């Protein structure tokens, strides 16, 4: 299924990472830029037609004309960012563009024409995020353009809504649960994240509790305290057979290697975070 075969019943799956990237771009925008826009990346399954928006990046632009109906994009920046993104994630393709605002902008037709060429295989999507927090919600909608007009007469585009779901993968669920706990029980140091190793400890404790529950269930079956359930038995069998048999010494070596990699990643990410904070403060000092 290509993007040109969209109908108003097509469903789009949006990864939460995209929302956070748009919010981050909006918070970091220049003072004279009221809204942000950028390129959407993702995949379209050929057989099922499942559309997933998995990534995005903002694009430098300038609005002009009456009611900001015209737009100039930094095409070199857009192409460079697209090349870098496809080096990291070659399976992701251009699906359309995002923008912030309360409604579809007057420049949407020009953007549609540009991203129609970028998509190569059909019609682009338009993700609109309302950052005004009306009703304490950040309303997010997906549009596709539908051609309107009469044969031989004036033609135009009408942006129609598509159904959309927020898709949470396993890593997304872990991150959202962590953020939920942080919101419910904020730390004294505002904005401070718990060390990643504490998340590993929490996950290990959770696995230990589930293993204890499984062991109690098996012991109750063996001691005839509870009736066996074939469905549960098959599920446990599938879980156990899916785990490869690894010697204790080899497992310890693998675990320690992964832990060293994690510590190295934490060190590098902390250095990058510090460098970004210094760069942002220096930039603010120059602007002031």
From Swiss-Prot:
Keywords: Cytoplasm, Initiation factor, Protein biosynthesis. It comes from the Eukaryota. The keyword Transcription does not apply. GO terms for cellular component: eukaryotic 43S preinitiation complex; eukaryotic 48S preinitiation complex; eukaryotic translation initiation factor 3 complex, eIF3m. Residues 12-149 form the MPN domain. It is found in: Cytoplasm. GO terms for biological process: formation of cytoplasmic translation initiation complex. Gene3D superfamilies: Cytidine Deaminase, domain 2 (3.40.140.10). Component of the eukaryotic translation initiation factor 3 (eIF-3) complex, which is involved in protein synthesis of a specialized repertoire of mRNAs and, together with other initiation factors, stimulates binding of mRNA and methionyl-tRNAi to the 40S ribosome. The eIF-3 complex specifically targets and initiates translation of a subset of mRNAs involved in cell proliferation. Component of the eukaryotic translation initiation factor 3 (eIF-3) complex. The eIF-3 complex interacts with pix. This is Eukaryotic translation initiation factor 3 subunit F-2.
């Amino acid at each position: 299924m290509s993007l040109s075969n969209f109908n108003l019943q097509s469903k789009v799956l949006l990864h939460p990472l995209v929302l956070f990237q748009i919010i981050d771009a909006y918070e970091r925008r220049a003072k004279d830029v009221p809204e942000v826009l950028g390129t959407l990346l993702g995949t379209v399954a050929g057989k099922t037609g499942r559309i997933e928006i998995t990534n995005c990046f903002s694009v430098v632009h300038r609005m002009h004309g009456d009611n900001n109906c015209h737009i100039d994009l930094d095409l070199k920046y857009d192409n460079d960012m697209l090349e870098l993104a496809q080096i990291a994630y070659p399976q992701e393709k251009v699906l359309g563009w995002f923008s912030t605002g309360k409604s579809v902008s007057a420049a949407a037709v020009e953007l549609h024409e540009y991203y129609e060429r970028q998509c190569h295989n059909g019609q682009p999507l338009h993700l609109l995020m309302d950052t005004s927090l009306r009703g304490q919600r950040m309303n997010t909608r997906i549009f596709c353009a539908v051609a309107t007009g009469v044969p031989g007469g004036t033609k135009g585009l009408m942006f129609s809504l598509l159904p959309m779901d927020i898709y949470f993968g396993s890593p997304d669920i872990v991150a959202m649960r962590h953020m939920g706990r942080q919101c419910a029980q904020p730390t004294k140091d505002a904005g401070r994240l718990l060390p990643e190793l504490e998340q590993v400890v929490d996950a290990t404790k959770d696995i230990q509790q589930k293993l204890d529950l499984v062991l109690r269930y098996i012991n109750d079956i063996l001691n005839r305290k509870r009736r066996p359930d074939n469905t549960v038995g098959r599920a446990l069998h599938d879980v156990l057979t899916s785990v490869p048999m690894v010697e204790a010494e080899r497992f310890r070596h693998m675990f320690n290697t992964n832990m060293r990699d994690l510590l190295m990643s934490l060190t590098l990410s902390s250095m990058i975070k510090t460098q970004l904070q210094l760069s942002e403060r220096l930039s603010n000092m120059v602007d002031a």
